[in-house]
Amino acid sequence: MGAPFSCPDCEDHPPAFDCVATRYQANGLVRDLIHRFKYSGEFHLRQILANWLEEALSDPRISREPFDAFVPVPLHTTRIRERGYDQIAALVELMAKRSHRPVWACLRRSRYTESQTRFSRKERLQNLRNAFELRKGSSVLGKRLLLVDDVLTTGSTLDECARILKAHGAKSVRAITVARR
């Protein structure tokens, strides 16, 4: 179980999301299972990873007030073709089914970006600039949203997605991830 932590970068440059909760460090077995699910097509691992994501729902920062819908961080269509599936959408779909909460796939990856894994914080922010947009016909005005991603490293992806959601009127954007680096 991870405890709340304070990030010096976030203190200097507050992110657009209201809070983020995660229960695991992305190393050892956790890192291995995430990588096998994402890159080796081991789709059956979604059960375990969805369970780990669900643990983050009990964090007081997440559970203190209800949310209207899960919002998966979207993959670009090129990545979906490469992997055969959208790993975050698969996890969120399973969580939504179990919890009877809706999924709003209201974000789309409008621009293909290089993998974030080798980039510094500054490079990650630049790489993601204008990479997401609200899907046409989507409305998040006044909604309390729970953004979902697999790994939190610098928070750049969550920040960019939350920025878009709040720019379109979301009341709050909290986030959960399977693990953090």
Question: Would you name each region that the model predicts?
Answer:
Residues 66, 93, 102-181:
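PRPP/pyrophosphate-binding module of the type I phosphoribosyltransferase fold
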Residues 1-97, 117-118:
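Extended interfacial segments that mediate partner engagement and assembly in macromolecular machines
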